[in-house]
Each structure stands twice: as C-alpha cells, then as structure tokens.
Swiss-Prot record:
InterPro entries: NA-bd_OB-fold, RNA-binding_domain_S1_IF1, S1_domain, TIF_IF1. One of its GO terms (cellular component) is cytosol. This is Translation initiation factor IF-1. Component of the 30S ribosomal translation pre-initiation complex which assembles on the 30S ribosome in the order IF-2 and IF-3, IF-1 and N-formylmethionyl-tRNA(fMet); mRNA recruitment can occur at any time during PIC assembly. It is found in: Cytoplasm. The gene is infA. It comes from Helicobacter hepaticus (strain ATCC 51449 / 3B1).
Amino acid sequence: MAKDDVIEVDGKVIEALPNATFRVQLENGHIVLCHIAGKMRMHYIKILPGDMVKIELTPYSLDKGRITYRHK
C-alpha cells in the first residue's frame, strides 16, 4: 500500500483494548478499531481514553486503522 492511498482523519479514543488496540470515534460518529503505529510504540507514547488522535484508514477496510499521532 502506497502512502498516497491512506485516508487521514481525526478522532477521539473511547476505549483501550489489549495489545495496544483502541476503539476510536471519528469526527463523523463512526467507531473504528485501531492499533498504534510502530514509531509510536518504539517511543513509548502512551494513549489513554479521551485523547484526540490522528488515524490512517485504508480505502480497502474503513473499519480498521492505525494511530499515527496523539494531539497535545
């Protein structure tokens, strides 16, 4: 998958699940299952419920995504 194909959206973490997986509610109300990107995992960036995050969705599966940034 090329970098150009991703869809970037903002959302709010509503639930933390095992194995660095989170349920994120997007701005339009959809709920997506997301995991943390590798760079965030390497740098031990903690994500808690209530945090605003930027996620990437693929055009193939719009119900799973990758968290790439945690807003301050």
